[in-house]
Amino acid sequence: DGVMFPNFDDRLRAAMLEETSLFFESVMREDRSIMDLIDADYTFLNERLANHYGINAPDGEPIVGDAFRRVSLPERQRGGLLTQASVLTVTSNPTRTSPVKRGRWALEQILGEPPPPPPPDVPDLPEDEQAVSSGSIRERMEMHRKNPACANCHREMDAIGFAFENYDAIGAYREKDGRFEIDPAGEFADGTRFRGAQDLKRIIAQRRTPFARCLTEKMLTYALGRGTESYDRPVVERIVGTLEANEYRFSTLVAEIVKSDPFRKRRGAATLADAE
């Protein structure tokens, strides 16, 4: 929404996308751990995006110009994909953040646990001025958790999404949502608590296996040109095990996919018929 976010223009949009592209490229080309995608101590910024983030160069000098440069992150409001403006913006609504979209994205794209589709006829949150001023987004979303049909999925999905409430709808850091205090704390379905985005990233990076499995499945899908099936599961698990034994290096992921049977041996019509 150009009225609510006048600083969001084509230059900022392009800078957001370039940061993510350069960051992923660095993980790949430098053969870094795939866990850097969850949290890292560096990113790539130009003047436009650095101003948006409120980040200076390590020497304290402002970052100047349109060219992107690698920047160390002395404080950890940023780091990894989850707190990059590109992801935070695409998982927001036009006028506000969306804990549901952000939580769903993290479950699907990071943890590999996509929630089921919502039941029919669930109303959207009212967006009129009176509703918005009546309480924080967390308070207004309590309606989802009061509906038994929504409660199970929204309990974890919303909690993960709320962890990113310190970032507004275009990914700028904030301490308050309007006049309301932000509470980014939550917990996973297993009861593990986190205090906000940094804590959430730390827990995901420590657990490692769910993200490694999720990324393996997505990379394998890309390599095969099809979705993974139940018969691919042993291959996925073998790749995850090899990743663990090799410090989760990106090159290990690529090499193991290329060496895998699903990649090397195309399933023919007869084989598929037998499987059915």
Residue ranges with predicted function:
Residues 1-221, 233-245, 255-276:
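Active-site substrate-binding loop specific to GH73 endo-beta-N-acetylglucosaminidase modules
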Residues 251-252:
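Alpha-helical scaffolds flanking conserved acidic
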